[in-house]
Amino acid sequence: MRKTIHLFLFFLFLTSLVQASGVGSNDLPADVIRLTDSLKQVYAPDGRVALFQTHYTVSGRKMMLRGVTTAAAAKEALLQGLGKAGYEVMDCMKVLPDEAALEGKTYGVVNLSVCNLHVKPDFASEMTTQALLGMPVRVLQFDGWYRIQTPDNYIAWVHRAGVRLMDSAEVADWNRAEKIVVTTHYGFVYSAPNRRSQTVSDIVAGNRLKWLGSKRDFYKVAYPDGRTGYVEKADACPEKQWRKSLKKDPGSILKTAYTLIGVPYLWAGTSSKGMDCSGLVRTVLYMHDMIIPRDASQQAYVGEHIEIASDFSNLQPGDLVFFGSPATAERKARVVHVGIYIGQGRFIHSQGDVHVSSLDASDPLFDAFNRGRLLFATRVIPYINKMDELNTTDTNPYYRWGVEESD
């Protein structure tokens, strides 16, 4: 009976707002706009990695608040601010992850070789990034698709087929399990330890699968959803052995980058199947167990900032070089492109495809367009695991879920 009364009162409140007001976001009271904007700057200044999305229905001093946020403190501050301003608020705003709707399964592991993530929960929506098989993610919300957050904190929507949902115990089991890491740019998992057997799926560099054992020239593996198969030993390496063998010096990183020459440009791509400019940087470093921010405009503000000398003498191989529009008195530089510096004015980048260009006008590989929009560089390799945004899979919080308990 009490629940029925609450629902009836809720209906009356909603009806009065809808009938009394058709207020859109452009017609919100100025004090509400100021409060909302100020809190967004504090709690979610970059909407790619944090959410503070509000929707108001207003009638006089009454309002219904809807929307989502990843910061409980942001919602609390908003409600306090609206209350102090004299508004009577019906709170329908959700703090993510939405534990109740997801029934406790607020974790997940990517279940496809390359998983496409979108701005909206729709295949027709713009693709914004990708995630790789075996990657742990935070599951925030369900709306036909899942809204997830990847280990670099990027937030986007993924189709249900892309992620295996898990609770905290299940993701801990996954993180603690021994794994193999795919080291070939492209390969397959087979249903039997035989290349002539039925394929289970394709795989790409950086994929991780649970290691169940070995049979002849194959590793037996398991997917997040429990499927099993076999990966050729030539295409993968046990994770612990892989970590020990990794070299993280600029020469080794550039050697990896060169193996991607000719791979086509793909907007939002972050795999050896196809990549955009920042996706190339991210893919190359991930193949050396380094996790950095997703986009060029995020990568530009981690590590050591370098103002580039006219003869490029203060650049080192492995530095990231950035391109775009220079800063003005009104705004900071607008970064739209990135490459990895090779030396002697040359850099490798993804633009059309992965190739080498030069900033030196006397070089036959001179790229006049990008030379004209060169901004600055950053040095990130020495700062891995020394800045929150720069880490590895053995220190990143997503890959550590449940691991500390067993250490």
Please name every model-derived segment.
Residues 257, 269-288:
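Active-site nucleophilic cysteine motif
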